[in-house]
């Protein structure tokens, strides 16, 4: 905390029995004999605290809480938009109520369990992103399936070779056109097998 506590103020430590949080607050000297209501900024639980009883607590316990807040590194003054401390004080006597000025700082130390939970959340490894199949991979997969449906006896290697040739010979497929036709041409299901030219029968001339 950057601002130093005025000598007329006294630091008191209040334990929230609802969320197990230690609240460190500074109270002006003229309010030390009052019964105040402390609002926990962690769980918003209201606590009625007798400051006179806190002043008679053991000094060693106060020093322990102060040392714990310094080591945790989470101590700080939390203020709302109006400038008042987040843990508002009000003197709750039978006849009057008193709200402390903004100079009365309020600090909070989260429990060790909450610290471990936050560290575990930040230490999670980044999830691996699944790569989206490219247009080529999607086309080859669908083309092999189509070729095998039309020709069940074809091998996977031949179907893959034919699908790759269809991708190379029909570039408009790259732009999302129908895989069945491209420019009036039909996709090849299998590679054509060259055949020997057939002999033609020569008819003779009759005289």
Swiss-Prot record:
Tissue expression notes: Expressed in leaf blades, leaf sheaths and flowers.
Entry superkingdom: Eukaryota
This protein's UniProt keywords: Metal-binding, Nucleus, Zinc, Zinc-finger
GO MF, one example: zinc ion binding
InterPro entries documented for this protein: HMG_box_dom_sf, YABBY, YABBY_C, YABBY_N
Localisation per UniProt entry: Nucleus
DNA-binding is among the record's keywords: no
Record CDD domains: HMG-box_SF
Pfam families: YABBY (PF04690), YABBY_N (PF24868)
Any single GO CC term annotated in Swiss-Prot or TrEMBL for this entry: nucleus
SUPFAM superfamilies (alphabetical): HMG-box
Zn finger (C4-type) location: 16-43
GO BP term, pick one: cell fate commitment
UniProt similarity note: Belongs to the YABBY family.
UniProt name for this protein: Protein YABBY 6
UniProt organism field: Oryza sativa subsp. japonica
Species classification: Eukaryota, Viridiplantae, Streptophyta, Embryophyta, Tracheophyta
Gene: YAB6
């Amino acid at each position: 905390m950057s601002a130093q506590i005025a000598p007329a103020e006294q630091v008191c430590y209040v334990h929230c029995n609802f969320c197990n949080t230690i609240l460190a607050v500074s109270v002006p000297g003229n309010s030390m004999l009052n019964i105040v209501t402390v609002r926990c900024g962690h769980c918003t639980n209201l606590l009625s605290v007798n400051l006179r009883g806190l002043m008679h607590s053991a000094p060693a316990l106060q020093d322990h809480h102060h040392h714990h807040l310094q080591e945790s590194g989470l101590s700080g003054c939390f203020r709302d938009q109006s400038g008042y401390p987040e843990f508002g004080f009000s003197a709750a006597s039978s006849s009057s109520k008193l709200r402390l000025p903004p100079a009365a700082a309020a600090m909070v130390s989260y429990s060790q369990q909450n610290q471990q939970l936050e560290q575990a959340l930040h230490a999670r490894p980044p999830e691996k992103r699944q790569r989206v199949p490219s247009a080529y991979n999607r086309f080859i997969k669908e083309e092999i399936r189509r070729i095998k449906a039309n020709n069940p006896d074809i091998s996977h290697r031949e179907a893959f070779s034919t699908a790759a040739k269809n991708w190379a010979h029909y570039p408009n497929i790259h732009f999302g056109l129908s895989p069945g036709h491209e420019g009036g041409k039909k996709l090849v299901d299998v590679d054509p097998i060259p055949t020997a030219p057939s002999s033609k029968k020569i008819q003779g001339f009759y005289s």
